């Protein structure tokens, strides 16, 4: 009987250890984002009439961007963590122009874009896939941030010959990255609800082996901004 009790106590101890190990593993699986480790951020301001903006993660100022469709370089910052508050503030003040929370993973690259005005101001945050395109190709994604009537619905992005690169992109959303031939300079944006109303747009030539984000913007006229990610 004594041996049986000893054996049962050993089983209980093993079970407790196993249960504790599973608990730690579950916590790790549920919370893959570490606080305060390094990540890289690129900041873009396409908000019309916003004035110059300071960019914050939490209470830390990361950089400043002008109101003239400016893009920063990637900036390394120890700002990873869940539910991190990202803010654009009127430069040199505590006045918040737009604010949003994001989960920021360590050792990742992100682009944050400010758009809109007043109560419609918003921040689009995207994790950037900076893996190299195939040799001789460029990699590009498309962002729909135009409130102009000509692009007020979801839009398709295509080559000038009609080949679709991204379909049904909502306002405030981005496509996945796609590979295209280097040298691309012409794009067509087509409203999904009005396929006969095609908008032809020009961009600077995309270089081979580089990675880009094309932003469609503008409140009265549709225009583009080309951001180089890598």
Regions found by a protein language model. Name each.
Residues 1-26:
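Sec-dependent bacterial lipoprotein signal peptides
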Residues 5-7, 24-230:
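Intrinsically disordered, low-complexity polar regions and short flexible loop motifs
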């Amino acid at each position: 009987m004594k041996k049986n009790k000893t054996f049962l106590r050993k089983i209980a101890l093993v079970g407790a250890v196993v249960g504790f190990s599973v608990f730690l593993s579950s916590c790790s699986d549920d919370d893959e984002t570490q606080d305060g480790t390094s990540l890289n951020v690129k900041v873009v301001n396409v908000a019309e009439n916003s004035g110059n903006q300071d960019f914050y993660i939490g209470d830390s100022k990361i950089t400043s961007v002008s109101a003239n469709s400016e893009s920063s370089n990637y900036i390394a910052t120890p700002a990873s963590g869940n539910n991190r508050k990202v803010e654009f503030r009127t430069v040199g003040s505590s006045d918040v122009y737009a604010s949003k929370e994001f989960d920021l993973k360590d050792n990742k690259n992100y682009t944050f874009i400010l758009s809109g005005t007043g109560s419609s101001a918003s921040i689009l945050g995207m994790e950037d896939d900076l893996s190299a395109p195939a040799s001789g190709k460029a990699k590009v994604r498309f962002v729909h941030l135009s409130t102009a009537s000509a692009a007020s619905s979801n839009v398709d992005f295509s080559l000038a010959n009609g080949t679709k690169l991204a379909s049904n992109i909502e306002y405030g959303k981005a496509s996945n990255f796609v590979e295209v031939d280097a040298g691309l300079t012409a794009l067509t944006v087509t409203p999904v609800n009005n396929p006969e109303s095609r908008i032809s747009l020009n961009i600077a030539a995309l270089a081979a082996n580089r990675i880009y984000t094309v932003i469609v913007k503008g409140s009265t006229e549709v225009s583009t901004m080309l951001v180089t990610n890598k």
